[in-house]
A protein has these predicted regions:
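General structural signal for secondary-structure boundaries
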Residues: 9-13, 63, 158
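Flavin-dependent oxidoreductases
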Residues: 1-37
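Hydrophobic pocket-lining "lid/loop/helix" segments that shape and contact the acyl-thioester
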Residues: 34, 62-63
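C-terminal catalytic lobe of FAD-dependent flavoproteins
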Residues: 50-58, 70-160
C-alpha cells in the first residue's frame, strides 16, 4: 500500500488562522490528515491506494497532491493550498490497524521497533516516541500493552 503527502510554503499567521499549532485527522476513507509546522507550513497527507510498485506510485504523486489540496480547500474554503514539496511512500499495516512499538521477545530488551504505522505515521509518531522513551528509561507506559509486538489479537482485527 502507498500513501501520499505534501508540504506548503510557510503561510502567514492570519491565513493559517485556527490551523496554526494543530493536528487534524479526518477519518473518512480515504482519510486526510494535516498538521502545521513551527514555521507556518501545512503538512497534508492521505489518499492511500493499493500501489506497491515504486515507479507507478511515484508517477501518481502530483495527482494525489492536487486531490489532497482540493479536499483541504473544500473543508476550509478561505485557504488556497499549493503543494511545494510532494512525495509518496509504501507502508505496512497490521490486522488490527495499530502500529507496533517496543522490543520483540526473540531479540532481547535492547532492540526496539516502531513499525507498521498503516500510513498514519504523523499521528502515531508522538505516541511511539513517548512509549519508546519510557521503555528505554525503564518505565512502564500505560499504552505499552496495546502497541506491544506480543499483544493478543483483538476484535479490531476483523475490521476489514
Amino acid at each position: 500500500r502507498s500513501s501520499y503527502a505534501f508540504v506548503t510554503d510557510p503561510l502567514p499567521r492570519e491565513v493559517l488562522g485556527k490551523l496554526g499549532h494543530t493536528l487534524v485527522w479526518e477519518s473518512a476513507r480515504p482519510y486526510l490528515y494535516l498538521r502545521s509546522t513551527q514555521e507556518g507550513r501545512l503538512l497534508i497527507g492521505g489518499e492511500d491506494d493499493d500501489e506497491d510498485i515504486a515507479e507507478r506510485r511515484d508517477a501518481r504523486v502530483m495527482e494525489k497532491a492536487r486531490t489532497l489540496a482540493a479536499k483541504v480547500e473544500a473543508l476550509w474554503p478561505d485557504l488556497e493550498i499549493n503543494p511545494t514539496f510532494c512525495w509518496g511512500g509504501t507502508f505496512a499495516e497490521t490486522d488490527d490497524g495499530l502500529p507496533y512499538f517496543g522490543p520483540h521477545e526473540s531479540l532481547g530488551p535492547r532492540v526496539h521497533f516502531a513499525m507498521a504505522y498503516g500510513g498514519n505515521g504523523i499521528t502515531y509518531s508522538m505516541i511511539g516516541a513517548q512509549l519508546l522513551r519510557a521503555l528505554i528509561e525503564g518505565r512502564e507506559h500505560p499504552l505499552g500493552a496495546l502497541f506491544s509486538l506480543q499483544r493478543e489479537p483483538s476484535m479490531a482485527s476483523t475490521r476489514r
